[in-house]
């Protein structure tokens, strides 16, 4: 069984049981964003989380070890075609240099970690149209001189 097999099984079960990512996350004690990423194969589960996920979804036993495998974090380098993903790509394209300038002005020369990192998605109801709130929280890592 490979990561893609587990991902496809999870999507099939999620659809069959009419589950949300939030319900799956609650069942295993993680956040919806993190568990979704793990189910898509971009993060590895601890043994405890993998066991809970396999049990909750009724996945085959061999899925546990696959969920615990360290992923190769790679993705298609082509410009995304999905409209939602493309808009995030567009945000980074338009505001990336701005964010870099502001972050480095506040923190110095370095980067925001995507390893020591968390992310949250919230919904804000608004009479002019509901708003998506993305919160990214990454540790600042200064570049070292030697």
Curated annotation (Swiss-Prot):
CDD domains the UniProt entry points to: Cyanase_C (cd00559)
Pfam family, one: Cyanate_lyase
Entry keyword annotation includes Glycosyltransferase: no
Active site: 87, 90, 113
Catalytic activity, as annotated: cyanate + hydrogencarbonate + 3 H(+) = NH4(+) + 2 CO2
Keywords annotated in UniProt: Lyase
EC number from the UniProt entry: 4.2.1.104
GO terms, molecular function: cyanate hydratase activity; DNA binding
GO biological process annotation, one example: cyanate metabolic process
InterPro entries to which the protein is assigned, alphabetical: Cyanase, Cyanate_lyase_C, Cyanate_lyase_C_sf, CYNS_N, Lambda_DNA-bd_dom_sf
Protein family according to the UniProt entry: Belongs to the cyanase family.
Function: Catalyzes the reaction of cyanate with bicarbonate to produce ammonia and carbon dioxide.
NCBIfam families hit by this protein: cynS, PRK02866.1
Protein name per the record: Cyanate hydratase
Taxon lineage: Bacteria, Pseudomonadati, Pseudomonadota, Gammaproteobacteria, Oceanospirillales
Originating gene: cynS
